[in-house]
C-alpha cells in the first residue's frame, strides 16, 4: 500500500479526516467487495499523483461500523470527499481512473 494512503479506525477518524488541513478522499470499502478491490490500485496511483493536495484514507466498513453508519454508507465502494471536516461530494460504486481523477479535480 502506498505510504500516502492511511487506514483509519472509528477512533482515529476525527484526527485523520475531520481535522485534516487538506481535502480528504475517504474510501469506504470491505475485503469481500470485488469492486473495492478493483479500484484499490487506482487509488494508490492517485494517492501518489495528488500527494500534498489530497489525503486518501481507507475505512473498512466491517471494522469501522460506527463511522460507516454515521455517514450512511449503504453501498461500497463509497468515496466521500471531505473539506474542512464536511462532506462536499460523494461517488458510489467503482469507476475508471479518469472518472476518479475528475472527481478529485472537481472537489479539491
Curated annotation (Swiss-Prot):
GO cellular component: cytosol
CDD domains: TRX_family
Keywords: Disulfide bond, Electron transport, Redox-active center, Transport
Domain of life: Bacteria
Function field: Participates in various redox reactions through the reversible oxidation of its active center dithiol to a disulfide and catalyzes dithiol-disulfide exchange reactions.
Family: Belongs to the thioredoxin family.
Name of this chain's protein: Thioredoxin C-2
Biological classification of the source: Bacteria, Bacillati, Actinomycetota, Actinomycetes, Mycobacteriales
Amino acid at each position: 500500500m502506498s505510504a500516502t494512503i492511511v487506514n483509519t479506525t472509528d477512533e482515529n477518524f476525527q484526527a485523520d479526516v475531520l481535522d485534516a488541513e487538506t481535502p480528504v478522499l475517504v474510501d469506504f470499502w470491505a475485503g469481500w467487495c470485488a469492486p473495492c478491490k478493483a479500484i484499490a490500485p487506482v487509488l494508490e496511483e492517485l494517492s501518489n499523483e495528488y500527494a500534498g493536495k489530497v489525503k486518501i484514507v481507507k475505512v473498512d466498513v466491517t471494522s469501522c461500523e460506527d463511522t460507516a453508519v454515521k455517514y450512511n454508507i449503504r453501498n461500497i465502494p463509497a468515496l466521500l470527499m471531505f473539506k474542512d471536516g464536511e462532506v462536499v461530494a460523494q461517488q458510489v460504486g467503482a469507476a475508471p481512473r479518469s472518472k476518479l481523477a475528475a472527481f478529485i479535480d472537481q472537489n479539491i
